[in-house]
Structures are given as structure tokens and as C-alpha cells.
From Swiss-Prot:
<dbReference type="GO" id="GO:0005739">
    <property type="term" value="C:mitochondrion"/>
</dbReference>
<protein>
    <recommendedName>
        <fullName>Small ribosomal subunit protein bS16c</fullName>
    </recommendedName>
</protein>
<dbReference type="InterPro" id="IPR000307">
    <property type="entry name" value="Ribosomal_bS16"/>
</dbReference>
<dbReference type="InterPro" id="IPR023803">
    <property type="entry name" value="Ribosomal_bS16_dom_sf"/>
</dbReference>
<dbReference type="Pfam" id="PF00886">
    <property type="entry name" value="Ribosomal_S16"/>
</dbReference>
<dbReference type="GO" id="GO:0003735">
    <property type="term" value="F:structural constituent of ribosome"/>
</dbReference>
<dbReference type="InterPro" id="IPR020592">
    <property type="entry name" value="Ribosomal_bS16_CS"/>
</dbReference>
<keyword id="KW-0934">Plastid</keyword>
<keyword id="KW-0689">Ribosomal protein</keyword>
<comment type="similarity">
    <text>Belongs to the bacterial ribosomal protein bS16 family.</text>
</comment>
<dbReference type="GO" id="GO:0009507">
    <property type="term" value="C:chloroplast"/>
</dbReference>
<keyword id="KW-0150">Chloroplast</keyword>
<dbReference type="GO" id="GO:0015935">
    <property type="term" value="C:small ribosomal subunit"/>
</dbReference>
<dbReference type="GO" id="GO:0032543">
    <property type="term" value="P:mitochondrial translation"/>
</dbReference>
<keyword id="KW-0687">Ribonucleoprotein</keyword>
């Protein structure tokens, strides 16, 4: 099973995160299947590859709670819902 989760980067007391698709059995800092975004909580900046995220979610990937909150604020779930209505 694949999860969308945060991978920590940055210095002490200055974290930044990459949003990655990774196998459930892998460690947080393990090798990612694909990097799909970036999140900086200090500046509240988010950069997402929305098309890739939607593809992973449609194939069964489960976002963690924090990533789910980030995706919800970016409107990704609304796009998925709109795509499913038009099909």
C-alpha cells in the first residue's frame, strides 16, 4: 500500500517538508516512489504536483492526516470530486 506522507528536511528548529509517495513499510526518511510536493510551515508555502497527486489517490494511495489537511486547503479533493462527477 502507498501513502502520501511528509519527509522532513531543513536544519534544527527550521523544518521544511517534502510530500512524497512511499510504501507503507518504508521508513519516513526512506526512498520515496515519487516526490509530489513541498511544504514550508514557517512561511506557510505549499507547492504541489496536483496531477500526480490525483493519479496516486485514484490508484489507492492514502494521505496521512497532515497531508490530507494540506491537500484539502489546496483544493485537491474538490478537483477529484469534480472529476468523478463529470465521469
Amino acid at each position: 500500500m502507498v501513502k502520501l506522507r511528509l519527509k522532513r528536511y531543513g536544519r534544527k528548529q527550521q523544518p521544511t517538508y517534502r510530500i512524497i509517495a512511499i510504501d507503507v513499510k518504508s521508513r519516513r526518511q526512506g526512498r520515496a516512489l515519487k516526490e509530489v510536493g513541498f511544504y514550508d510551515p514557517r512561511k506557510d508555502q505549499t507547492h504541489l504536483d496536483v496531477a500526480t497527486i490525483i493519479t496516486f489517490i485514484q490508484q489507492g494511495a492514502q494521505p496521512t492526516d497532515t497531508v490530507s489537511h494540506i491537500l484539502n486547503r489546496a483544493g485537491v479533493f474538490e478537483q477529484i470530486h469534480a472529476m468523478s462527477i463529470h465521469e
